[in-house]
Design a protein with these regions (language model features):
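A general structural signal for stabilizing positions within well-ordered secondary structure
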Residues: 27-29, 49, 78
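Acidic, metal-coordinating helix/loop segments flanking the phosphotransfer/catalytic sites
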Residues: 19, 37-57
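Short, well-ordered amphipathic alpha-helices
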Residues: 15-25, 44-45, 72-77
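CheY-like receiver
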Residues: 46, 54-102
Length: 102
């Protein structure tokens, strides 16, 4: 089974670190995966609209210029007809409660 993952973070250096970590982890646990990296929530949502039900997991940064991770997650929930695992990556504790309602 192929695990399809989207990761969205406007900070490219953070994105590279997380991408490298995911690559190492998936190889270590022997899971076949595909990882797409986005620097814009708008671009991620455009691709989700085009390819409904494509991603199994979405990793979102909370603070981005075009929209925050909560807004992106809410739109993904509206667009995708099946359950997608959404995980937020942030150092802002004030977003913790908000993330549970998505």
């Amino acid at each position: 089974m192929l695990l399809r993952i989207a990761y969205c973070d406007d900070e490219i250096e953070n994105g590279k670190k997380i991408r490298d970590y995911i690559n190492q982890l998936m190889i270590q646990i022997e899971v076949e995966f595909e990882l797409d990296f986005y620097v814009s929530g708008t671009v991620l949502l455009e691709n989700v609209k085009k390819q409904n039900d494509y991603y199994d997991m979405v990793l979102l940064d909370m603070e981005m210029p075009d929209m925050n991770g909560i807004e992106i997650a809410e739109k993904i929930r509206e667009l995708v007809s099946r359950e997608v695992l959404i995980t937020f990556l942030t150092s802002y504790p004030e977003y913790m409660q908000q993330s549970f309602r998505v």
